[in-house]
Amino acid sequence: MIKILSIGNSYATDATRYVYGIARADGVAMKVVNLYIGGCSLARHYRNMLGDAAAYDFEINGITATGVKLSIKDALLSDDWDFVTLQQASPLSTNYETYQPYLDSIAAYVRKHAPKAKLLIHQTWGYREGTPRLEKLKVATHAEMFEGAKKAYFLAAERICADGILPSGEAICLAMREKTEHMLLHRDEIHLSLGLGRYIAGLVWYGTLTKRPIAENTFRDFDEGVSEESVAFAKRIAEQAIIEYSTFQK
């Protein structure tokens, strides 16, 4: 069984929603856990880590476990993880200065308590075109925001000697450029759509983590409708991002 722990926020919720189902459709046993606090930044994860705060909702295989609150240490010690992922909160993702010194400390903490796990950077995506949130970040477009985040995430991965990058952001940026008018990638200004957007990110995670092909995957249990045209589109886009980042995976 492949075991993945994300120290994340709602972006990790979006990205991991379908990973377990995609794996199951491919006959691969997988456990996918997200430690969730909405909008949680690396600085807040760091403070929670120092205080051993049982502040996180526990999402397992895309579903929230009701009534369960965990600390980062609780989660790290709860299983023998194969992968642990880290990410920055989206409003801060373009500014590498906000990553430190928190990222270094969290990475060291993860390696102390989950020494066998590969440590990955989850590269998040840009906001929907036209949202005023882009102006607040002093960028004009989704692509411009993503380019800033991309540079910061590369610096982050290099700094902590990460074992790889999960290129969700790259895939969504590619999809934004190539999608047809009826293809919905965001459900609001910042989050992925419950169908196609989350599916693309899930394929990226699954393909990157397992190095297995995704073209013939039969998963279709979406939270909102995804046409067969969009399924094919998602697989093509995800595969493109996976291949582009394959040289960064150890």
Q: What kind of region is each of these model predictions?
A:
Residues 2-3, 11-100:
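Conserved SGNH/GDSL esterase-like catalytic core that processes O-acyl groups on lipids
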Residues 5-7, 122:
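Short hydrophobic segments within beta-strands
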